[in-house]
A protein has these predicted regions:
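Hydrophobic/aromatic residues in alpha-helical transmembrane segments
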Residues: 26, 66-74, 110, 248-255, ...
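Hydrophobic alpha-helical transmembrane segments
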Residues: 53-57, 84, 88-89, 125, ...
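Membrane-interface helix starts
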Residues: 13, 17, 47-56, 225-239
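Membrane-embedded helical hairpins/re-entrant loop segments and their flanking transmembrane helices
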Residues: 66-96, 255-277
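Short, membrane-interfacial amphipathic segments enriched in basic
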Residues: 31, 202-220
Length: 353
């Protein structure tokens, strides 16, 4: 038994190291591709004003307020005693573990902290996966709407990339559609069970994982059926997600407008066009399977914006965007995780006494 457990630990460590190696490789490729612009990029970053840093910090808080409210809306439907503050804290817990584990620990952390708040694990699993699916579908719809509104600008500026952009959008829509179908269409569970039985016959060692996946799918569909009965709740979730994405998508515009010598009138695009390009970068990066989106967001963002701006400006903006959407939430989340651990230890001591 101990040998089996140690094997699992070694396997998880190996997976993490492979992810880390893959991320380092991606970042190395990005550095090699843009090393000629590094000096100019560092100069651009050194000119960032304290006001911009404050705006970036506020955008992180607003994003997690929205994310926490989304969690609360979903959980509150069946567990009215769940407080809003727990949802806000849960958002930062997930952000910390998402970065610390390169993406794989976010879902586990979300389910774990929902369970600590009194939500049974099966329900917490279904709720978290439903929230993830709503997130993906909302992002795809928002990005598609912005793409259509600014289509003339995108067609004129990126005619060479248009085929790839449309192909990427098709991928985004397929992923969102499949996730939505898995969560809501009853026969999808039957199809997945048939596939699991086929795989189980070929690979008996997969029995435990396939059984666990089957249970999670059943929990997801049960929670989805319950939540889909409330159209007003779905509308609120969609609008909250749009507001949440907006707090991220305005970051490049703020950075570009506050660069020395640049103002809104000096840029080759309007606020809406910049907003749409950022949304497009984030959505298309989701099609590329990289840990926590590291490397893919940077590559797509830089590829699009460097056709309109000097490469150094595009690189400095994407670095600040990544800092705000990944590193800063992780740093703030670390304090939330530490605080939760301290509170848990105090509770255990009181119980022991």
């Amino acid at each position: 038994m101990m040998r089996h457990d140690s094997g699992k630990v070694l396997s998880s460590i190996l997976k993490y190291l492979l992810k880390l190696l893959f991320v380092c490789l991606l970042l190395g490729i990005l550095y090699y591709s843009f090393k000629d612009s590094m000096e100019d990029m560092i100069t651009e970053l050194s000119k960032v004003s304290p006001q911009v840093i404050l705006v970036l910090f506020l955008s992180v808080i607003l994003y997690h307020l929205c994310e926490g409210h989304i969690t609360w809306l979903i959980v509150h439907k069946t567990h009215p005693e769940y407080p809003r503050l727990k949802g806000f804290c849960n958002a930062f817990y997930c952000s910390f573990y998402k970065t610390a584990t390169l993406g794989s620990g976010s879902g586990i952390a979300g389910i774990y902290y929902l369970n600590k708040a009194g939500i049974p694990v099966p329900n917490a699993t279904g709720m978290y996966f439903f929230q993830y699916i709503v997130h993906k579908v909302s992002m795809a719809v928002y990005s598609l709407l912005l793409f259509l509104v600014t289509y003339r600008f995108i067609h004129t500026s990126f005619a060479y990339y248009q085929g790839y952009i449309l192909l990427g959008f098709a991928g985004v829509c397929v992923i969102a559609g499949v996730l939505l179908a898995v969560a809501t269409v009853p026969w999808m569970q039957t199809a997945c069970n048939l596939l699991a039985n086929h795989l189980r016959a070929k690979h008996p060692s997969w029995e435990e994982k396939l059984t666990g996946a089957g249970h999670k799918l059943a929990q997801l569909q049960a929670e989805s059926r319950s939540l889909l009965k409330d159209p007003l709740l779905l509308l609120r979730l969609f609008l909250c997600n749009l507001l949440k994405f907006t707090t991220w998508y305005i970051i490049p515009w703020m950075v570009f407008c506050n660069s020395p010598g640049d103002g809104p009138g000096d840029l080759p695009f309007s606020f809406l066009q910049c907003f749409a390009l950022t949304s497009l970068s984030q959505s298309l990066a989701g099609v590329i399977p990289t840990p926590a989106g590291i490397g893919s967001v940077e590559a797509v963002f830089t590829l699009l914006f460097r056709r309109l701006l000097p490469e150094a400006k595009a690189l400095s903006a994407v670095l600040l965007y990544r800092f705000t959407t990944m590193l800063l939430p992780c740093a703030i989340g670390a304090f939330f995780v530490l605080g939760e651990r301290i509170v848990s230890l105090h509770r255990k001591k009181r119980t022991a006494d």
